[in-house]
Curated annotation (Swiss-Prot):
PANTHER family: DEGV DOMAIN-CONTAINING PROTEIN DR_1986-RELATED, FATTY ACID-BINDING PROTEIN TM_1468. May bind long-chain fatty acids, such as palmitate, and may play a role in lipid transport or fatty acid metabolism. It comes from Deinococcus radiodurans (strain ATCC 13939 / DSM 20539 / JCM 16871 / CCUG 27074 / LMG 4051 / NBRC 15346 / NCIMB 9279 / VKM B-1422 / R1). This is DegV domain-containing protein DR_1903. The keyword Signal does not apply. Keywords: Lipid-binding. GO terms for molecular function: lipid binding. PROSITE patterns: DEGV. InterPro entries: DegV (IPR003797), DegV_C (IPR043168), DegV_domain_contain (IPR050270). Hexadecanoate binds at T59, T93.
Length: 288
């Protein structure tokens, strides 16, 4: 069976890691010259640190030696002696480039796939890869399946405050002030390996309605039964529960579980984020 690795910022739950056997590359977080692990800087502490200092936190490149050790450990537990690494989108982070460089040390035993996305959308790809590997799929079959999954995944999220986008240099001070004053929430989506702006809405209720509408449109486009997740960063639990209730009122036979999103995404978009993740149910995730 082919082993599977991905990044710690893929927001895979401990239970899922246990049954899937996925190995994680630990993504470091940097703030004012200090380097932290995600365990050392969980979302609540991360948010407080950024708010207190007014300085951004960023995900840093993973050290080559750490990548090599993780690959070696995963290979040792693989019956086939082969490994697939699912990396976060190469347009978002340097992790794909680092993993691909290190993979060269292992020859044909390691294949690195550009996941083209982040957070739990990346985690879903890794879980599906592990599910396929458990069924005996080879490199080519896994790569083709993940390419199709990427094309048929919806990841759209509403940002609560513009302050973190300002701190990270994505918008200016004036734009952040006006946007917060008006109660505007940007709606962002990951499409074709990039983050794109979809809309700006006023208030939580409008944000949830827009996410619900995006799900309806996606379901109509795919014409398939979906897997649904209501993601949230810290502080976004209430909005996620509201979204969950509205999704379940429409898609009565489909669960839409809440899924916490960790420090990697929080560092970039802040607390209070609510997201919808959807993809066809035929893409199995093992025991999920």
């Amino acid at each position: 069976m082919i082993a599977v690795t991905t990044e710690s910022t893929a927001d895979i739950l401990p239970l899922q890691l246990g049954y899937s056997g996925i190995h994680l590359l630990p993504v470091p977080l940097g703030h004012q010259g200090q380097v932290y692990s995600e365990r050392e800087l969980p979302p609540d502490q991360l948010v407080n640190l950024i708010r207190t200092t007014g300085e951004p936190a960023r995900t840093l490149a993973i050290d080559d030696e750490v990548v090599a050790r993780t690959f070696e450990a995963a290979l040792q537990g693989s019956k086939s002696g082969r490994l697939v690494h699912v990396a976060s989108g190469s347009r978002f982070t340097p992790h794909f480039e680092v993993a691909a460089r290190v993979a060269g040390q292992f020859g044909v035993r390691v294949q690195v796939i550009d996941g083209g996305t982040v957070s739990y959308a990346l985690g879903v790809q890794a879980l599906h890869a592990a599910h396929l590997a458990d069924q005996g799929a080879d490199f080519g079959q896994i790569a083709r399946a993940l390419a199709e999954l990427r094309e048929r995944t919806l990841l759209t999220f509403a940002v609560e405050s513009l302050d973190f986008l300002r701190v990270n240099g994505r918008i200016g001070n004036v734009a952040a002030f006006i946007g917060n004053w008006l109660g505007l929430r940007p709606l962002l989506a990951v499409e074709a390996g990039e983050v794109v702006s979809k809309a700006r809405v006023r208030g939580q209720a409008a944000a949830v309605r827009t996410l619900l509408s995006a799900t309806h449109q996606f379901q109509h486009q795919t014409g398939e039964t979906l897997r649904l997740y209501c993601g949230h960063t810290i502080g976004g639990e209430g909005a996620a529960e509201q979204l969950q209730g509205q999704l379940q009122a429409v898609y009565r036979d489909l669960p839409a579980p809440l899924h916490p999103l960790g420090s990697g995404l929080t560092a970039n978009v802040g607390p209070g984020v609510v997201a919808v993740l959807a993809f066809p149910r035929r893409f199995g995730l093992g025991h999920a």
